[in-house]
Amino acid sequence: MTHRELPIRIAYVVPVQGSAGIFGPSCEACGDLAVAELSCGGGVLGREIELVIVDGGRRPAVVAQEVATLWRAGAIDAVVGWHISAVRKEILRYVGGELPYVYAALHEGEFRTPGLFMTGESPGAQVLPALDWLRRQFGAHTWCVVGNDYVWPRQIAARAEAHLAGAGMSHLGSTFTPLGTSDFTETLDWLEVHGPDAVLVLLIGDDAVRFGRAFARRGLDEISLRFSPILE
């Protein structure tokens, strides 16, 4: 079989487990749809596309090592991922600049890493304009931030804090919890003390669902708006 007859094999890194595992079925369906549409058009450069599923819901180092092993074995030609930023950063440590890498999830901002293509929403195009809109439409002037404790929520929170100050709004504080948190009692107590007009929720997947339900049970939905840029 000649090179042109071989499929283009893509490591498709999506969460199958963990907090972000709730997004897994949607991600896999999108991948299948993309392959079907490309196949109808003759593939890419006349070659079929084959997805190699990599579970991006595990520890970042474990995910990155699997991608690197596939690359070194000649088993993949590119990487496409919808997963958390901590996984992206680790994958880049192993294959950055070596393989085309399309990162489809929302992210912290612009990057200029060779071979990395960011197609998801940046804070300047999504979160920050939404803060302004919520102020205009609902009078949300005071804000708290609740997020998971890793790079994306922390960097978005920092961008939001600076934006709020520049736009004449108030940032009352931020709190971060580990991925997989199930008990948000302390977080809800903290929100009750601050009583913000709105809460920017930077929690992932199942964590966001559990927080939202606990927030409503506490009756905080009668006091504060919630805005989340990522919720299944």
Set out the residue ranges of the language-model regions.
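Extracytoplasmic "Venus flytrap"
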Residues: 3-7, 11-30, 60
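Extracellular glycoside hydrolase catalytic/binding regions
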Residues: 99-130
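Short beta-strand elements in bilobed, periplasmic/extracellular small-molecule ligand-binding domains
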Residues: 41-57, 113-115, 164-184
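An alpha-beta-alpha
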Residues: 120-176
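Short, well-ordered alpha-helical microsegments
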Residues: 87-89, 127, 153, 184, ...
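Extracellular/periplasmic bilobed ligand-binding domains
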Residues: 161-163, 167-232
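Beta-alpha junction/loop-to-helix N-cap segments that form part of ligand/metal-binding clefts
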Residues: 27, 44-109
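Short, polar/charged alpha-helical segment
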Residues: 24-44
